[in-house]
């Protein structure tokens, strides 16, 4: 009886694992001697330019995943332009035109999606901002001290740009980011080849910021958070305590 229960449990576990598993693929939509385009999701593309023809498959500090779920897309590569279309956007690149520029690459929304048109060099206007290195000396948004290197006394806190924007799209340039060396015993960081290559990520999400974060984790990896109860009770204040306190 016990053996049957154990066998049934193992079979059930295997079924659950197979149901939860998802086929992952490289999703390379197009590649030639110098450019490679990967469809990470219907709203996220990876765009690579390699002048020496050597594309990067190593993990980077930004992108730790190189395999992705299946995505529906259409590829047109006849003629002078390469065109990749998903349910959210359309990318066009002029064949054999070299490094990505505003003259040979454009990404725009498809009909019915949140409207945008992006070319290399276009800047966001509605970034929702991120975080800052330190709040030392800050009273609300104003710096009150003179010894903090990041801000001067009286200056307002200037948050760094974050991932999301009201523009409905985000652009990430990982061309200079460090790579992992794929050592099976002890992975370590290594520099990218200084060959003038480009390694970009473009995300189109409209105002669906939750979906944008989900798409980001497809290539950047999930960010596990420890449970709140593990931290116990924390309380502190910035200014010094007096001996009476």
Segments (PLM) and residue ranges:
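Short, acidic/polar
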Residues: 241-245
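Catalytic and substrate-binding clefts that recognize carbohydrates or anionic sugar/phosphate headgroups
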Residues: 77-227, 236-238
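Short, well-ordered beta-strand segments enriched in hydrophobic/aromatic residues
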Residues: 37, 45-49, 83-91
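A low-complexity, Ser/Thr/Gly/Pro-enriched, surface-exposed linker/loop concept
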Residues: 40-79
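Bacterial Sec-dependent N-terminal signal peptides
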Residues: 1-24
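Short solvent-exposed loop/turn micro-motifs enriched in small/polar/acidic residues
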Residues: 30-31, 68, 75-77, 154-156
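Short N-terminal segments immediately surrounding and downstream of signal-peptide cleavage
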Residues: 23-36
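Hydrophobic faces of well-ordered beta-strands that scaffold small-molecule active sites
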Residues: 231-233
